[in-house]
C-alpha cells in the first residue's frame, strides 16, 4: 500500500490505469490485466516511469500497440507501458522521423502525402513504428532495414541513446534490440522523391492483395509463424490439413492458414494450444519445425 501511494505521488500527472484488462488493447482481444498500465505523453514521462520502476524494483515492459503479440490470461505484473500518445511524425525533406507509438500504416500515408517512395511495402502492416523496428517488419520484398537511418532507444537502465542502422544487426524478423532489451522510442527513415500517383497506385495494389489474402475481419495476432527457408508457413499448415482447425474460440483461418483468428471469445490459452498443435502436426507431416513470429508474454492463469 505504501508503494502504491509513492507511485501515485512520484508519477503524478501521468496517465496510469490500475489492474487494467489488456484484452481491451490487444489485436487478439485476449489477455489478463496489467498491474499498472501507463501511457507516457513524451520521452520525459517515459524516463520518469522507468527510473521509478527500477528504483522500486518493479518489473516493467513496453507493449507497443499490441499487434504481433499474445498476452497470457493471467496478465502482466508491474508496469506495462503503451506508446499510444508517443505518436508524432515529422517530415524533413526526404526524411521521416516518427515516435515509436506512431501507427505504421498512417506513417506510410504521410510518406504518400509528401510524394516519398520506399515505404509502400509497409502500407498494410498493422502495428507501431517501434514494434516494426523491433521486429524488422516487412512485406512484399521490403523491410524496415531497407529504409531505417537510425533510432533512439531507452536502455533498461533508463538512458537514452542513438543507434545507427549499422548497429542494429537486422535479420529476418530480428534486430539488436531483441537481444539487449533496449526500447525503441523514435526512428528516422530515409525515403526517395517519387510520383504521388505511382506511389498511391502501388499502395492500393498491396492493400488489395492483403485484403484478398488475409482475414482482416477477425481479431488476430497477425502472422503467427516465421517463413521457413524455402517454404511458406501457411502452405505447410494447409498441407497438414489444418485450415479451419479450431481449439476453443481460436481457429486457423480458412482464408490464410498462417493466421489464427479469434472467432468466439477465445483465450490466450486457446492460442497457445492451437499454436502447439499446429507446430506438432506440421512437423509430423513435413518434417519442418515452424518457428513462432508472434511473441507470447505474461502469466498463465
Curated annotation (Swiss-Prot):
InterPro entries reported for this sequence: FAD-bd_PCMH, FAD-bd_PCMH-like_sf, FAD-bd_PCMH_sub1, FAD-bd_PCMH_sub2, MurB, MurB_C, MurB_C_sf, Oxid_FAD_bind_N
Record organism: Streptococcus sanguinis (strain SK36)
UniProt xrefs under SUPFAM superfamilies: FAD-binding/transporter-associated domain-like (SSF56176), Uridine diphospho-N-Acetylenolpyruvylglucosamine reductase, MurB, C-terminal domain (SSF56194)
Any matching Pfam family: FAD_binding_4
Domain of life: Bacteria
Keywords of this entry: Cell cycle, Cell division, Cell shape, Cell wall biogenesis/degradation, Cytoplasm, FAD, Flavoprotein, NADP, Oxidoreductase, Peptidoglycan synthesis
Gene Ontology, cellular component aspect: cytosol
E.C. no: 1.3.1.98
Pathway annotation from the record: Cell wall biogenesis; peptidoglycan biosynthesis
Protein name (Swiss-Prot/TrEMBL): UDP-N-acetylenolpyruvoylglucosamine reductase
Function: Cell wall formation.
Enzyme class, spelled out: oxidoreductase
Active site: 173, 223 (proton donor), 293
GO terms under biological process: cell division; cell wall organization; peptidoglycan biosynthetic process; regulation of cell shape
The reaction(s) this protein catalyses: UDP-N-acetyl-alpha-D-muramate + NADP(+) = UDP-N-acetyl-3-O-(1-carboxyvinyl)-alpha-D-glucosamine + NADPH + H(+)
Xref: PROSITE patterns: FAD_PCMH
Family matches, as PANTHER family: UDP-N-ACETYLENOLPYRUVOYLGLUCOSAMINE REDUCTASE
Subcellular location: Cytoplasm
Family statement: Belongs to the MurB family.
Co-factor(s): FAD
The FAD-binding PCMH-type domain, residue ranges: 30-194
Disulfide bridge positions per record: none
Amino acid at each position: 500500500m505504501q508503494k502504491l501511494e509513492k507511485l501515485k505521488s512520484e508519477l503524478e500527472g501521468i496517465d496510469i490505469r490500475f489492474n487494467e484488462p489488456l484484452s481491451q488493447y490487444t489485436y487478439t482481444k485476449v489477455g489478463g490485466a496489467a498491474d499498472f498500465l501507463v501511457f507516457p505523453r513524451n520521452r520525459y514521462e517515459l524516463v520518469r516511469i522507468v527510473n521509478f520502476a527500477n528504483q522500486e524494483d518493479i518489473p516493467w515492459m513496453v507493449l507497443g500497440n499490441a499487434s504481433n503479440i499474445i498476452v497470457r490470461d493471467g496478465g502482466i505484473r508491474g508496469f506495462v507501458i503503451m506508446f499510444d500518445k508517443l505518436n508524432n511524425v515529422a517530415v524533413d525533406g526526404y526524411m521521416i522521423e516518427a515516435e515509436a507509438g506512431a501507427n505504421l500504416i498512417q506513417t506510410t500515408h504521410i510518406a504518400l502525402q509528401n510524394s516519398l517512395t520506399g515505404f509502400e511495402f509497409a502500407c498494410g502492416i498493422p502495428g507501431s513504428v517501434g514494434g516494426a523496428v523491433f521486429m524488422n517488419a516487412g512485406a512484399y520484398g521490403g523491410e524496415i532495414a531497407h529504409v531505417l537511418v537510425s533510432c533512439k532507444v531507452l536502455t533498461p537502465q533508463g538512458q537514452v541513446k542513438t543507434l545507427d542502422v549499422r548497429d542494429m544487426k537486422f535479420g529476418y524478423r530480428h534486430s539488436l534490440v531483441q537481444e539487449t532489451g533496449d526500447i525503441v522510442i523514435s526512428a528516422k527513415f530515409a525515403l526517395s522523391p517519387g510520383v504521388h500517383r505511382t506511389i498511391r497506385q502501388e499502395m492500393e495494389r498491396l492493400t488489395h492483395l492483403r485484403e484478398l489474402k488475409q482475414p482482416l475481419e477477425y481479431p488476430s495476432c497477425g502472422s503467427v509463424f516465421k517463413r521457413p527457408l524455402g517454404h511458406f508457413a501457411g502452405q505447410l499448415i494447409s498441407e497438414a490439413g489444418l485450415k479451419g482447425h479450431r481449439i476453443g474460440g481460436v481457429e486457423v483461418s480458412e482464408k490464410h492458414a498462417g493466421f489464427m483468428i479469434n472467432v468466439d471469445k477465445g483465450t490466450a490459452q486457446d492460442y497457445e494450444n492451437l499454436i502447439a498443435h499446429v507446430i506438432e502436426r506440421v512437423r509430423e507431416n513435413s518434417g519442418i519445425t515452424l518457428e513462432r513470429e508472434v511473441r507470447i508474454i505474461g502469466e498463465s492463469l
